[in-house]
Amino acid sequence: MNFNLSRISALQIFQLIRFSTLILIGVVFSKAGLATSEIGQYETFLFLAGAVSFFWLNGLIQGFLPIVRGESNSAKNAQFFSIFYLLLIFSFLAAGFVLIFEQSISGLLLNGSDVPFLKYLLIYLLVSSPASLIEYIYLVQNHSRKMVVYGIVSFLLMFLLVTLPEVFGKTIEYSMAGLVASVVVRFVWLLVLLFRYSTPIPDVAFLRKHLKSAAPLVFSMFLSGSAQYVDGFIITSFFDEATFAVFRFGAREFPLVLLLANAFSASMLPGFANQSNLKTNLEQIRQNSEKLGRTAFRKCTGFQ
């Protein structure tokens, strides 16, 4: 079946698949009879990984989208590999931070509990953040259907590797190993795409330009997104992992409009790489934002 799928719709579908998978994993954990404390270990693992990476990861990705050259250039360039190197450096710094301050994190932020599955966490930090570049490579290259197919396959694999151990009565450690295995597979696929669309030589001029544009975004992301982590650390500092699991499940929601709006915002950024099309891009933003607003309003009223 041939159908047109825009970059906006593709990224929105991808983000919905990603978030839905995380919710479904939690549902399977609770239905499989997993102890609340073990679910708390899983939630703490993801929480810590997000806390040390969310701001620089989102800021660096949002910063490179408006300046990277995409599918209009037939020759390979070094830009994708350059941002990959940058993400890899920050990933090593995040993993090093957790490793160096493990005891402080345990004593001050986890109520004396050990950092859950530290070895898995370090591997996860090293590979998961760079792997987040995949969907944006597809976005910049305007490969919408490939992005959706990748989202379905990768998150189905993640769902199976994380939940099947619990279905068969294994401990939570097997699920954590499955989670890490799923992001390692994504990391390998990232390398395949990088060698397909880029050259492994750092573009220093591009990196300077990128860091200059991304620095305020990283700071902004840190300020705007830190509230949820402050709330979480208040719970982990005074209560055990079982209580944190209850808190995470109780505070969890399905932010449909926010997911659609964020995906829309990110999908429009590559258009600004070509300043000659600025007027056209602004008109597309106006039209698509009106469409998104009408769609979001109908869906929200339908849920009342």
Predicted regions and their residues:
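Signature of the first transmembrane helix
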Residues: N2-Q62, A95-L99, F159, A215-E241
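Alpha-helical transmembrane segments of multi-pass membrane transport and lipid-handling proteins
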Residues: F81-L110, L160-V167, E283-Q304
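Membrane-interface junctions at transmembrane-helix termini in multi-pass inner-membrane proteins
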Residues: V127-V149
